[in-house]
Amino acid sequence: MELTWFGHSTWRVTVGTTDLLVDPFFDNPHTDTAPSEVAVDHVLLTHGHADHIAHVGAFADTHTVGTPEVTGYVADETGVEDTTGMNLGGTVELGDAFVTMVRADHTNGLETGYEYSGGTPVGYVISDAAPTQTGDGDATTFYHAGDTSLQSEMKDVIGPYLDPDAAAVPVGDHFTMGPMQAAVAVDWLDVDVAFPMHYDTFPPIEVDTADFEREVNATGSQADVHVLDGDETVDLSDAL
């Protein structure tokens, strides 16, 4: 499994021969990549805020997954034609990837001249094998937390039952959890690798990622914190 961080919460996740793009937003200071330079098989949307769906229209010909509220919105507003609406707890098989939708603790607004509630925001657990309690345990699994605060589902459900190896967690504070809460999330999830995201995009979420690393260490977590540069790709098997 390969991960590319395009800044903010925008990630390409490559599972086998399948490329997924989470939350396309390329107008951020971390990336020099244009949407037209990115070819993927599927787009995953965590919620409808502009800094997560701004460039979904650039992928209008690409199959797009999200909650029914968000997929319906982007179909109407941006011309995305092929969508799958799903809901919390569901898993879809997308090529070589298995994608499970999980809860995020945030708000979700959809803009149509005025902003209205867009339903529940989500995160995704992405794996190269279907989630099961009877498998051989050899799956590689990545958790994209979406925009969220610290929430007990990380400790009670996502960590023990979906068992991610690595997690991308927002650390920018103000709109999401900051370094301290994000570090507790990493500890609860019991991941081997943690990637900070959703920071240094605009002034309210400017943070020092070294604070996140210190907070992770303070929890006693054994997770390695990997602070990626924008447009950097990492092979997760090398990081684990």
From Swiss-Prot:
Q: List the disulfide bonds.
A: none
Q: Does the keyword Cell cycle apply?
A: no
GO molecular function terms attached to this record: hydrolase activity
UniProtKB keywords: Hydrolase
Q: What start-end ranges are recorded for coiled-coil regions in this protein?
A: none
> What domain of life?
Archaea
Q: Which InterPro entries match?
A: Metallo-B-lactamas, RibonucZ/Hydroxyglut_hydro, UPF0173, UPF0173_UPF0282_UlaG_hydrolase
The similarity comment for this entry is:
Belongs to the UPF0173 family.
Output the HAMAP family linked to this UniProt entry.
UPF0173 (MF_00457)
Q: Which PANTHER family match?
A: UPF0173 METAL-DEPENDENT HYDROLASE MJ1163, UPF0173 METAL-DEPENDENT HYDROLASE MJ1163-RELATED
Which NCBIfam families does the record associate with it? Answer: PRK00685.1
The protein's name: UPF0173 metal-dependent hydrolase VNG_1038C
